[in-house]
Amino acid sequence: MPDGFASHEERAAFIAGLPKAELHLHIEGSLEPELLFEFARRNRVAIPFASIDDVRAAYAFTNLQDFLDIYYQGMGVLHTEQDFFDLTAAYCARANADSVRHIEIFFDPQGHTARGVAFETVITGITRALDDAEARYGITSKLILCFLRHLSEAEAEATLDEALPFLGRIAGVGLDSSEVGHPPAKFERVFARARSLGLKTVAHAGEEGPPEYVREALDLLKVDRIDHGNRSLEDPALVARLAASDMTLTVCPLSNLKLCVVDDIADHPLKIMLDADLKATVNSDDPSYFGGYVNANYQAVADALDLSRDDLVTLARNSFTGSFLSDAEKARHLAAIDAYA
């Protein structure tokens, strides 16, 4: 039996109701095939799929770049403020069903402005849906603007310029897209500028890239959180540093499986991270492409790694303590976890 539970079913029910935050979610990565077809029809965009089954069959990846190729293709159906509203509203409904009480979501404006979609169109649609989710479900949110690392720092600077009128709705900046060959050092100046504007900073590092990329994210980008961070475990000194500094890692188990970062979910390093006192969290990354929202990720690692009640509570607590909420808001959520557990 799982430690702290009478059965696997009891653990699953515990996960379902456990209050949690999600800190690593790309809103464009929550585009379900049904919505893909709806937006394509709505905007008269041709897509290379005849059916929803065709789309799901295409969601077979061997690495990050395989996924990114189809991710950007899917993004092409998003044109209007209503599209971004509907996309975000659909994710928020799923998050609510998974007992998610706070979300910090990434958006990729460069993937839209390059297609002629205005920055304002993107952010207004997303924030309208986030406001609606707070009113409807009580879910609070933060928005993180991600720079695409396969593009230049100058292009990131231009995107930050476009964001200036909307800084009241943007909590931070991040770094995503193709990791290998695009080290954090490439974006040192634009991250410094973002910090000077009062924005939080996060970066994808150590997913496919080496531990050195995690060090660069810490030392050069001065990030508040590391997104993924799996390969940090290859460097004991880095692990010790991350643990000593209470650096949150936003880990994405089903993403790691789908992108072949791990060969089997039983090989996932999440439990090793917890045992090393790393502040790991569980997140869904791009759930429509990787086969599961946040509770499915919790369930997958709970089953494969035989996580205990204490492990699950730690993961949920980490998701709030690692968030960009105020200390008072964090305390309220931690009290809710304690009352539930």
UniProtKB/Swiss-Prot annotation:
Binding annotation for Zn(2+): H24, H26, H204, D285
Catalytic site positions: E207
Cofactor binding remark: Binds 1 zinc ion per subunit.
InterPro entries according to UniProt: A_deaminase_dom, ADE, Ado/ade_deaminase, Metal_Hydrolase
Function: Catalyzes the hydrolytic deamination of adenine to hypoxanthine. Plays an important role in the purine salvage pathway and in nitrogen catabolism.
Family: Belongs to the metallo-dependent hydrolases superfamily. Adenosine and AMP deaminases family. Adenine deaminase type 2 subfamily.
Protein name: Adenine deaminase
Organism: Sphingopyxis alaskensis (strain DSM 13593 / LMG 18877 / RB2256) (Sphingomonas alaskensis)
